Amino acid sequence: MFKNQFYIIIIVLAVVLLGSCKGFNHIQKKGTPQEKYDASMKYYEKGDYYHAIQLFDELIVLFRGTEKIERIYYYYARSYYKEKDYILASYHFKYFAKTFPRSPFAQESLYLSAYCKYLDSPKFSLDQTSTKAAVRDMQMFINMYPNSPKVEEANKVIDELRLKLIRKDFNAAKQYLKTQYFYAAIYSLNQHIKDYPSSPYKEECAFLIIKANYVYATKSIFSKQEERFNNAKTAYNDYMTKYPDGRYVKDANKLLHNSNKGLAKIERFRNRRYRAL
């Protein structure tokens, strides 16, 4: 019994799907521009964005220069948005806002263009080109519509995206230290502090600069060690000035102690050489 019911359901669905395809094909091939317009809106309202997009593609050409083109293009962009094709949706929303700046949909379209880039932004470990574009476009929206009710949400999106960029930059700097590219690590950690003054990783960066300079000194040739141990001490003083009660004070003190030991060893070696002369 249940098996028969299952087959009946399959047959009914197949008939409905076939009828739907026939209806679409008929409209697409033989429908008038107005019939295609009406059908595209019905497909959109039903949530059939795939077929709506195909008809909108034609309608953009058929209705170019008419009053209806604005509405057609807006729903064309929204169809891509609903289909979660955020790259194309962003492009078409931006094009709409530029082409129809006086439209009641222009403000929303410019926001959604940036928001689509936000939705397309990958996790922090991947390439962040779309993240940077989202920040830029969201800021452009705020500049153009400073009184929009969407400004607060836009600022939250920017903060979230910037935090992702900050995290990526910080992890890239740490990776230099992990792979023992000490000069690059020191430069990148210092640059992170300059580029991102609100970074939640600033204190850790300041500590890692001490560590990078110290380890760099221990792995350097003798003639470079004194300068690099002293660089570690300078970084220590900078850390303690900014974070006297910081999370890494104990470890920073150990690095200072070891840097002083390294400098003392260099001084003893010099004294022995001097006496030998």
Model regions and ranges:
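Bacterial N-terminal signal peptides
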Residues: I9-L17
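Acidic, polar-rich low-complexity tracts and alpha-helical solenoid repeat scaffolds
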Residues: F2-Q5, L17-L277
